[in-house]
Structures are given as structure tokens and as C-alpha cells.
């Protein structure tokens, strides 16, 4: 496995591989890898001749009062996990390398960015779109793998790739959970032992909404009301959003259906966690 920091070196390396006819699978991350990332890497290993992992804490997708400075980093540990998952190339650029002096290009996105995380994190998805477009240009992947925990991000990247005719197959992978149901996230490391227990309210809310829907409940107000009661009963929990949306368009739904997305963002103390489920999907 090779670790590359320089943008031009990475680009030349993959262009050489492409000339040899190699199929490149790509897993873009912000590092501090966990089993969720490992599932993406292992799947990527089966989908390409060469597996590339990027590790880059992208400053343009963090807001002014967000956790850019404190976001957890562990390049040595990340590289060890990557190697165990069969990664061939790790691309870990610097912010200066990705955004040199004079950088000014943006990617204008459409209505998929407006609700959910887009409403509470203005500018976030603009930053995601720019860095993903740049990474696709540098790595030249045939396919790229993203987790469904960031459901809105996945939808936006699919749409952007389609609209801009980027020759990359976008693969969404299931959420990976801890044994007690908490969705794996690098930000879980911020939680105290007590907060870690409180964070289980997100999964409890998902289970309750799924249970009620399976029992025939389709009222959006009743489903979200039950979920909200579960969250607000937890001392340090505060709701950012709890919503039912169409899983394709992310538009609001009048009544819940099998293809409805239940998505939530909750702060446990100062740590913002997200989770989701499509009601008709196998959990």
C-alpha cells in the first residue's frame, strides 16, 4: 500500500493505472476510520483492480461554529485499517494542495440541498460538491462508494454525477451499526460514556417509527410525534430535525409509504448525530 500526499503525484499515478486498463474503485473519507468505512473498503476491493482511499478533512464543508479544528484525526491508525482491508493507494492531501491560492470555483447545487442537513448547515453541501468533484478529477475512479448514513449527501452526489455526466458509478452502502444499534460515526468519539448511552435514542426512534409503520400507521404527524417523544425524554438530547421525506426527491410526504425516508439529526450535548431509515427497507 502506498501513501500519497501530493495532488499531481496522485493524478499521475492513477492516469498510469488507467492507461494499463485498470478499473479503479474509490472510497472518499475524512479519516478517523471505523467499521462503517471498513465495509466500504471491503466492498470496493471486490469492485476494482485498484482500490483508492482518500483521507481529507475538507475545510470547505464545515461552518464557522462547527468542529473543523477538533475533528478527530489518526492517519497512522487509518492507514493500518486501510491496508488490512486491501487498499492499494491512500491519498491524504493537504488543504493547501486541494485549495491553492487563487482557488475560486464552486459547484451550484439544486433543491436536494435545501432540506434536512442543508437547512441547518448552510454551505455544507456546496463544500462537499466541490471536494468530491475535485477528488473524482484527481482519482479518476470507475466507481465510488458512499455510506447511506449520509443519505442526503449520497442523493446529492448521485444527482451531481448524473447532471455533470461524470463517468463514475455511485454505490450506496448500508449503515453499519454498533451491536446496540448506534450508527457508527467518527463523531461518536466526542461522546462521554453517559452521552453514548443517551445517543441510543436515535435508534430507538427509528425502531419505533418502523414498528408503527409496519403496524399500519401512515400519519406523518403521529409517526414524528412518537419519535420526538423518545428524543425529548433524553436529558442532553435536542432535536435539530425529525422528518419524513420522499427517499428520491427529498420532498415532504403527505402520508408515510414504503419509500419514505425517516431522517433525524439530534444533538447529544454539543455532538450532532444523524441517522435515517427508508421505511420499507430491510433494517
From Swiss-Prot:
Q: What pathway does the annotation place this protein in?
A: Cofactor biosynthesis; (R)-pantothenate biosynthesis; (R)-pantothenate from (R)-pantoate and beta-alanine: step 1/1
Recorded GO molecular functions are:
ATP binding; pantoate-beta-alanine ligase activity
What Pfam families does the database record attribute to this sequence? Pantoate_ligase
| Keywords assigned | ATP-binding, Cytoplasm, Ligase, Nucleotide-binding, Pantothenate biosynthesis
Query: Which biological process terms from the Gene Ontology are attached to this UniProt entry?
Result: pantothenate biosynthetic process
Active site annotated at which positions?
A: 37
Keyword presence, Methyltransferase: no
Q: Where does beta-alanine bind?
A: 61
Question: Entry's InterPro entries?
Answer: Pantoate_ligase (IPR003721), Pantoate_ligase_C (IPR042176), Rossmann-like_a/b/a_fold (IPR014729)
Q: Which reaction does it catalyse?
A: (R)-pantoate + beta-alanine + ATP = (R)-pantothenate + AMP + diphosphate + H(+)
UniProt main location, coarse = cytoplasm
Family to which the UniProt record says this protein belongs: Belongs to the pantothenate synthetase family.
Main role? Catalyzes the condensation of pantoate with beta-alanine in an ATP-dependent reaction via a pantoyl-adenylate intermediate.
What is the protein's given name?
Pantothenate synthetase
Q: Which organism is it from?
A: Trichlorobacter lovleyi (strain ATCC BAA-1151 / DSM 17278 / SZ) (Geobacter lovleyi)
